[in-house]
Structures are given as C-alpha cells and as structure tokens.
C-alpha cells in the first residue's frame, strides 16, 4: 500500500511541475507560447494561370458569370454568344466571331467585367448578343448575365428604355398571337412586348425568334419575380442583331 501511495505522490509531483513550468513559460513568454501552439497553416499555392485554349476560355467565361452553354471545349453558337457578351463588358467592338489567340489570352486573363455608363438599374437587353444584364442596384457592381431571345428582325423588340407597366404571375395566352403562351410575363412596351418564359426553354434560341417579346429561361424569369422586380422597374433594349 505504501508503495502505491509513493508512486501516486510521484505522479502528482511530476504533473504539478509540468503545469507550473507551462504556466511560467506562458506568463513570461506569451507571444512565443501562442505561436508554439498555433496550428501550422497549409501552404497555399498560387493558382496556375490557364493556358488559352478552347476549354480554358469557356472555363474563364463561366467564372466571370458569362453563360456559354456546355463547358466542354467545343465552341458552338452559345460559345459565340459568350464571346459577344465578353467583348461588350470589356469595352471591345461587338461581334460573335471566334476569338483569335490574342483574345483567347485576354479572356483567360480577365479578372472582372465592367458596365459602361449607359447601363441602368434594371434589365439591359442587348439585341446584338441576345443577352441581358440584370443590374440589381445603383452600385452597378451587383449584376447577373442571362440568355434572351428577342423579336425576329426587321422590327423585332422595340429599342428604348421602358418601364414594367403590368405583369401576370401565371401562364398567360397572348391576345395578339393565338396559342402564344407566355410564362409569368412582365409587360414593358406599348405594343404589348414583355419579358417572359416560353412554353419550353429550348425556345430561348441564340438568335431572335419571338414575335417581339423577350424570351427568357424559366429560372431567370422566376428570379426576377422572386426579387420583386416589377411595376415601374426599367427595361432597356439596345443594339442591333447582325446574324
């Protein structure tokens, strides 16, 4: 019994010595103590710059929030739409051409997009690119880029800056076009033109295909409704389709 009591006393003594040493070190050298017990951070490697090729160009556009269709390294009409949007939002001449090597490098090096002074808070519809930039507040930094399909030319969707005058939160059949069903339309122009979803998202083509309205994907018109976009909010239509 005396043996175990002696061993217990020795263990307690060792514990007290360690605790006292730890407390003393912490009190005398607080900065060193904190650094000693801080976790060692993982080494973060600098991101490797992307090489300018078909796949990485699409990846770069996607990271910038520019839709390009499938990110697969195969450039199609949706990719050309993305190139057009990128050119607009980086201050270049608008076209849907495939980028040359210099432009490919510029795309993968682009860090941010910039809206010019003509953009307004609201939905800005570019007929040349068949795209819309939804600017959500006056900072002009909070925006989203989406596909649209405007009216068939000549004529098509009226150019100008308009306000939403009325909207219908359900499927609605056009008065002017029999069996012309619109999903949750928001009307803005005096000729009954509207932002709306179509019977099928596949009807939102990369080219002008409507009777004058602005077709959107269902998810995008839903976002507008969910955000409270509506009466009095602005719709700006500009540009010219050159297919």
Please identify what each model-predicted range represents:
Residues 23, 27-32, 156-159, 171-243:
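Exported/periplasmic cell-wall-interacting domains
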Residues 45-56, 62-106:
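Short acidic, glycine/serine/threonine-rich helix-capping segments at coil-helix boundaries
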């Amino acid at each position: 019994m005396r043996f175990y009591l002696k061993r217990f006393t020795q263990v307690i003594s060792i514990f007290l010595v360690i605790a006292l040493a730890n407390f003393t070190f912490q009190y005398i050298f607080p900065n060193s103590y904190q650094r000693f017990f801080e976790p060692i951070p993982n080494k973060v490697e600098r991101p490797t710059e992307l090489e300018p090729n078909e796949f990485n160009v699409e990846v770069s556009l996607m990271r910038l929030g520019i839709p390009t269709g499938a990110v697969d390294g195969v450039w199609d009409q949706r990719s050309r739409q993305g190139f057009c949007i990128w050119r607009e939002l980086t201050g270049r001449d608008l076209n849907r051409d495939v980028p040359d090597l210099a432009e490919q490098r510029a795309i993968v090096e682009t860090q941010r997009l910039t809206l010019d002074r003509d953009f307004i808070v609201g939905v800005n519809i570019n007929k040349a690119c068949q795209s819309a930039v939804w600017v959500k507040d006056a900072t002009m930094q909070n925006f989203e880029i989406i596909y649209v399909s405007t009216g068939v030319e000549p004529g098509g969707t009226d150019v100008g800056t308009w306000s939403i005058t009325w909207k219908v939160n359900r499927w609605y059949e056009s008065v002017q076009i029999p069996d012309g069903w619109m999903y949750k339309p928001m009307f803005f122009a005096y000729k009954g033109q509207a932002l709306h979803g179509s019977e099928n998202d596949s009807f939102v083509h990369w080219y002008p295909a409507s009777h004058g309205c602005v077709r959107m994907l269902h998810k995008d018109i839903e976002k507008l409704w969910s955000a409270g976009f509506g009466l009095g909010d602005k719709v700006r239509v500009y540009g010219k389709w050159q297919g």
